[in-house]
C-alpha cells in the first residue's frame, strides 16, 4: 500500500541538517494530512487533522501561508498524540511513503514522534519523492544550482502534468491529493517506473484504467482554512468589540488628549506602501486627529497631493460641525550615511525622519531630499551629517524606526555608541529633536524602548509615540506583503528572513494607520507622550505650496530702448510683434493693428509676456541651428502675436481663428504652446536651454507608473503562484475599467455603460472573486494594490525652466533614462507649484 502525506508547520527550521533530537530547531506540526491507497492506486481512506497547539502560538507569517491561526487550531484541532496514533495505524499498513519534498515532512513528524516518546521509525518504509532531479528534468524549469533545472514546486509539477492549477496550495489536505494525483500520473506515463521502485508493475497495471486519460482527482473536499480562521477572528471581534474594549481601558485623562500620526508612508514610497493619501486624510478625520504627517522614504513626491487632499477635506467641514480640521505636516524619511558621496562600498545609512516646521523648513527639506538623489544616490538616495547640518534650519527630527541611528546602534553595536548618536542629534537640533517610540509588538522594539526611556530622562529629550504605517487598515497587511514581493520579484510563499532562500517582509501585521484610540491604548502607560506630539503640531505652521508660475528672466538686448524700464518685457514683445507683422503682412490695416494690440493687452494683463519672449527665442535659436521646427499645434494657432513672432506658421487672420481659445481675457491661465522639433534636433535645443539658463534651472518632469487593473492582477497572480493561464484568463475578463469601478459601481450602470460581452465578463470576474480559491484571493488582493506606484519615469516632452536654482521651488531626483534632473512632482501639479513647463516634442516626420 501507499501512504501519501503532507504537513503544515509553524515555520522552517533554523538548521536543515540538525538532528531530530534538537527539538528546539524543528518547527511544530499544525496540520497532518494523508491518503492511503492500495497496491493498484485505489483510494482506501483520506484524513486531515489540525493539531491543537500545546504551549506555542502559530506565527502570523506562517498563518499567512497556510491559513491556520492559533485560534482555529485551538478551536477545532486534535491533541498531538491522538493524531499521531491514527497516522501510525495507517502507516503500519503501507509499504511506501510518498510526499513532495518529503524529507522535510519526515523530519517534522520524526521530531513530533520524539516529543511524544514514540519509537516509530518512518525511515523503515520505502520513501518516494515527487521533488527530485527526475521531476526537475521532466518539468525543465531553469534556475537550478550549477546550471541544472530547478526542482519543481508542487504547483509547478501539477501544472505541468495536468495543465491546471490546484487552488488550495499550502493546505496539507489539498497538497496530499495533488501529490497523490501527480505521483500516480508519473507512474502511468512511465516517468516513475521499475527502476525507481519495486511496486511499479502492480501499480502500473492498476493505472491502465486511465490509459486514455490522465489520472483524475479523488473527489476529496478540503476545508478552506483561511476562511475558517477569518470566521473565528470576525466572531471574536463581534463578541468583544475592539473599540469599546480599547476605550474602556484608556485612562480618563488620556481620552481627551489629541493624537496625530507623525510617521506615515504613502503610495509614493514606491512599491513599499499601499496607503493612498486621500484615504489617510479621511481616516485621520474620522479619528479626530488635529494633524498628520507624511514621511515617504527618500522622496517628497506626494507633498503637493497631500496639501491638496487636506485642503479639500478641511473645506468640506461646515462651520457648525464638530469635526476637527487637519493640519498638514510635510516630512521625509532620509537615509543619513557616513559619506553620501562615497560609492565604493554600500552604505544605506540610518533612516531618520525630518518634518518641516514652515515654508523655509520645506525648502531645506526639499534641498536635502534633492541632494540625496543628485549627489548621494547609491542603491538608495542618501545624505550625510554635513548635508543635514547645512540645511537644518526650521526642521524637526524624529529618531526613526528600528533602522534609525539610535535604535540600530542599540541593537547592533552598543549602548554607549547609541548615546553618542543621541547627543549629536540633540546638540544639533536642540528642542526640535524627539525620540520616537514604536510598539508594533516586536522584541527588538521592547529592548530599544527600555533604553529610550532611560535616555529621555537622562538627557531631557522628549519621546513621541508613533506607528510606522505602510497600509491603511490591518486587513490590508497581506496586500502590502504582496506589494513587497512585487518589488523584489519574489513569491509570497518564500519565507521572510535574511539570506539565500528568504525574502524581505514586515515582521507582523501591526504596521497600519491606527486610530487615535488604538494608539492611546498602546501607550496608555505614558500619557505625557501625547503632550509631546501636541508640542510638535503647535510648532508647525500651515503654508501653501501652490503659487503663480514664476518665469525665468528674459534678457532684453541692451540696445533696445524703451520709455519704461518697468514695462520692458511688454514693450519688447510689442516691438518684436510689429516687426514680425511687417514681414508677414503687406499692409497693417486698422483691423489687424487692433487685433494685435488686443492680444498684447491680454498678454500684458495675464503677466506672461516673458513666456512669449522665451518661446520665440527658442524657436529662433532652433532655426539658426538648422533644426526643423513644426508649424505649431493646438489653440496657439489662433494667436496673431504667436504668428508674428514665428512661434506658429499659420495665419489666424486668413483662417479666422479665435485668440480666445488660446488665452481668454475673462479666464486668464498659463498659455500652453507645444513646440515640434525634428527628432534629432530636439536634443540640441535642450542643450541650448541648459546653456542659456543653467543646468540647475532646467529639468524634465517625473511620471508615475501605476499598477492598472490588469497589471495588478498579473503581478498579484505571480506572487501568489497562480498559474499563468489562470492569470491571463482573469486579466482578459477586465474591460477598460478600474477594478474599483467594476466592484463599486451599480450593476445597472455597468450594464448601461458596457458592451454585452464586457458586461458578461465583469459578472464572471465578480463571481470568481466570491470564491474560496486562489483565483478569488488574487482578484481581491489586486483590488487593494490597484493604483499603487510601480515605477517612475520621465515625461516624454515636458521641460521645466525656473528663474533660479530649481531646488528653491521643488525637490528633484535623477532618472535612469535622462541626463537631466527630474522634478519629484509630476505633470499634474508642476504648473500649480509655480513652474514654467514647456513641451518640446521630437518628431521623425519633420
Kindly give the residue locations of the regions a language model identified:
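Conserved non-catalytic scaffold segment of RNase H-like nuclease domains
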Residues: 1-122, 139, 143-164, 170
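Conserved beta-strand scaffold positions in the cores of enzyme catalytic domains, especially
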Residues: 2-4, 46-48, 73, 127, ...
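N-terminal phosphate-binding loop and flanking beta/alpha elements of the actin-like ATPase fold
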Residues: 66-69, 128, 603
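A short alpha->loop->secondary-structure connector
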Residues: 113-124, 372-380
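Histidine/lysine/aspartate-rich catalytic loop segments that bind and position anionic ligands
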Residues: 121-137, 263, 400, 406
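Alpha-helical transmembrane segments that form the membrane-embedded catalytic/substrate-binding core
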Residues: 172-182, 634
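Acidic two-metal-ion nuclease catalytic site recognized across multiple nuclease folds
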Residues: 180-247
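Alpha-helical scaffold/interaction cores of sigma-54-like transcription cofactors
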Residues: 232, 236-846
Amino acid at each position: 500500500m501507499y501512504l501519501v502525506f503532507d504537513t503544515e508547520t509553524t515555520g522552517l527550521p533554523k538548521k536543515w541538517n540538525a538532528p531530530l533530537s534538537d527539538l528546539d530547531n524543528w518547527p511544530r506540526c499544525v496540520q497532518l494530512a494523508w491518503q492511503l491507497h492500495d497496491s493498484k492506486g485505489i483510494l482506501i481512506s483520506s484524513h486531515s487533522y489540525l493539531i491543537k497547539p500545546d504551549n506555542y502560538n502559530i506565527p502570523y507569517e506562517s498563518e499567512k501561508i497556510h491559513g491556520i491561526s492559533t485560534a482555529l487550531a485551538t478551536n477545532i484541532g486534535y491533541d498531538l498524540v491522538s493524531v499521531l496514533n491514527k497516522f501510525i495505524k495507517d502507516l503500519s499498513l503501507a509499504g511506501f511513503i510518498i510526499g513532495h519534498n518529503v524529507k522535510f515532512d519526515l523530519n517534522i513528524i520524526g521530531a513530533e514522534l520524539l516529543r511524544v516518546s514514540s519509537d516509530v521509525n518512518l525511515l523503515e518504509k520505502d520513501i518516494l519523492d515527487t521533488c527530485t532531479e527526475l521531476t526537475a528534468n521532466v518539468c525543465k524549469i531553469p534556475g537550478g544550482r550549477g546550471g541544472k533545472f530547478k526542482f519543481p514546486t508542487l504547483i509547478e509539477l501539477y501544472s505541468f502534468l495536468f495543465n491546471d492549477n490546484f487552488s488550495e496550495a499550502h493546505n496539507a489536505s489539498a497538497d496530499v491529493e495533488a501529490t497523490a494525483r501527480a505521483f500516480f500520473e508519473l507512474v502511468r506515463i512511465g516517468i516513475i517506473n521499475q527502476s525507481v521502485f519495486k511496486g511499479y508493475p502492480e501499480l502500473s497495471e492498476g493505472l491502465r484504467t486511465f490509459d486514455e486519460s490522465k489520472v483524475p482527482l479523488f473527489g476529496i473536499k478540503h476545508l478552506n482554512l483561511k476562511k475558517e480562521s477569518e470566521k473565528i477572528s470576525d466572531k471574536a471581534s463581534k463578541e468583544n468589540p475592539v473599540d469599546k474594549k480599547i476605550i474602556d481601558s484608556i485612562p480618563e485623562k488620556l481620552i481627551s488628549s489629541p493624537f496625530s500620526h507623525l510617521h506615515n508612508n504613502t503610495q509614493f514610497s514606491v512599491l513599499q506602501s499601499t496607503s493612498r493619501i486621500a484615504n489617510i486624510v479621511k481616516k485621520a478625520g474620522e479619528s479626530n486627529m488635529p494633524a498628520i504627517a507624511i514621511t515617504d522614504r527618500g522622496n517628497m513626491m506626494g507633498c503637493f497631493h497631500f496639501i491638496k487632499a487636506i485642503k479639500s477635506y478641511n473645506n468640506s467641514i461646515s462651520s457648525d460641525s464638530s469635526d476637527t480640521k487637519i493640519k498638514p505636516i510635510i516630512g521625509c524619511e532620509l537615509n543619513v550615511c557616513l559619506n553620501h558621496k562615497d560609492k565604493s562600498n554600500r552604505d544605506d545609512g540610518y533612516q531618520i525622519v525630518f518634518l518641516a516646521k514652515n515654508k523655509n523648513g520645506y525648502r531645506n527639506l526639499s534641498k536635502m531630499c534633492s541632494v540625496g538623489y543628485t549627489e548621494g544616490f547609491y542603491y538608495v538616495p542618501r545624505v550625510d551629517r554635513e548635508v543635514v547640518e547645512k540645511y537644518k534650519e526650521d526642521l524637526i527630527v524624529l529618531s526613526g524606526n528600528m533602522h534609525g541611528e539610535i535604535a540600530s546602534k542599540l541593537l547592533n553595536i552598543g549602548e554607549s555608541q547609541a548615546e553618542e548618536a543621541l547627543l549629536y542629534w540633540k546638540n544639533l537640533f536642540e528642542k526640535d529633536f524627539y525620540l520616537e517610540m514604536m510598539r508594533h509588538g516586536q522584541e527588538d522594539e521592547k529592548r530599544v524602548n527600555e533604553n529610550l526611556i532611560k535616555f529621555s530622562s537622562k538627557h531631557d529629550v522628549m519621546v513621541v509615540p508613533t506607528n510606522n504605517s505602510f497600509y491603511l487598515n490591518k486587513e490590508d497587511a497581506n496586500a502590502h506583503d504582496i506589494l513587497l514581493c512585487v518589488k523584489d520579484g519574489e513569491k509570497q510563499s518564500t519565507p521572510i528572513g535574511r539570506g539565500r532562500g528568504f525574502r524581505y517582509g514586515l515582521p507582523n501585521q501591526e504596521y497600519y494607520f491606527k486610530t487615535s484610540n488604538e494608539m492611546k491604548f498602546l501607550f496608555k502607560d505614558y500619557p505625557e507622550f501625547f503632550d509631546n506630539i501636541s508640542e510638535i503640531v503647535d510648532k508647525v505652521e500651515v503654508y501653501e505650496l501652490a503659487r503663480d508660475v514664476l518665469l525665468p528672466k528674459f534678457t532684453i538686448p541692451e540696445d533696445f530702448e524703451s520709455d519704461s524700464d518697468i514695462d520692458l518685457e511688454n514693450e519688447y514683445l510689442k516691438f518684436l510683434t510689429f516687426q514680425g507683422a511687417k514681414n508677414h503682412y503687406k499692409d497693417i490695416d486698422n483691423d489687424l493693428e487692433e487685433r494685435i494690440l488686443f492680444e498684447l493687452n491680454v498678454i500684458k494683463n495675464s503677466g506672461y509676456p516673458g513666456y512669449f519672449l522665451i518661446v520665440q527665442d527658442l524657436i529662433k535659436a532652433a532655426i539658426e541651428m538648422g533644426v526643423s521646427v513644426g508649424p505649431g499645434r493646438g489653440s496657439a494657432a489662433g494667436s496673431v502675436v504667436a504668428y508674428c513672432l514665428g512661434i506658429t506658421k499659420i495665419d489666424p487672420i486668413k483662417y479666422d481663428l479665435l485668440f480666445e481659445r488660446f488665452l481668454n481675457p475673462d479666464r486668464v491661465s498659463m498659455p500652453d504652446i507645444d513646440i515640434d522639433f525634428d527628432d534629432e534636433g530636439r536634443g540640441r535645443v535642450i542643450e541650448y536651454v541648459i546653456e542659456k539658463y543653467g543646468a540647475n534651472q532646467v529639468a524634465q518632469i517625473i511620471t508615475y507608473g501605476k499598477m492598472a487593473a490588469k497589471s495588478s492582477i498579473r503581478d498579484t497572480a505571480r506572487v501568489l503562484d497562480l498559474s499563468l493561464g489562470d492569470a491571463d484568463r482573469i486579466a482578459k475578463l477586465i474591460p477598460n475599467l478600474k477594478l474599483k469601478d467594476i466592484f463599486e459601481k451599480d450593476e445597472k450602470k455597468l450594464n448601461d455603460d458596457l458592451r454585452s460581452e464586457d458586461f458578461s465578463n465583469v459578472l464572471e470576474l465578480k463571481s470568481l472573486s466570491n470564491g474560496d480559491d486562489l483565483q478569488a484571493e488574487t482578484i481581491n488582493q489586486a483590488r487593494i494594490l490597484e493604483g499603487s506606484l510601480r515605477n517612475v519615469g520621465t515625461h516624454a516632452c515636458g521641460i521645466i525652466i525656473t528663474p533660479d536654482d530649481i531646488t528653491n521651488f521643488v525637490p528633484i531626483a535623477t532618472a535612469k533614462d535622462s541626463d537631466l534632473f527630474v522634478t519629484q512632482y509630476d505633470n499634474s501639479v508642476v504648473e500649480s507649484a509655480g513652474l514654467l513647463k514647456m513641451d518640446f516634442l521630437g518628431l521623425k516626420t519633420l
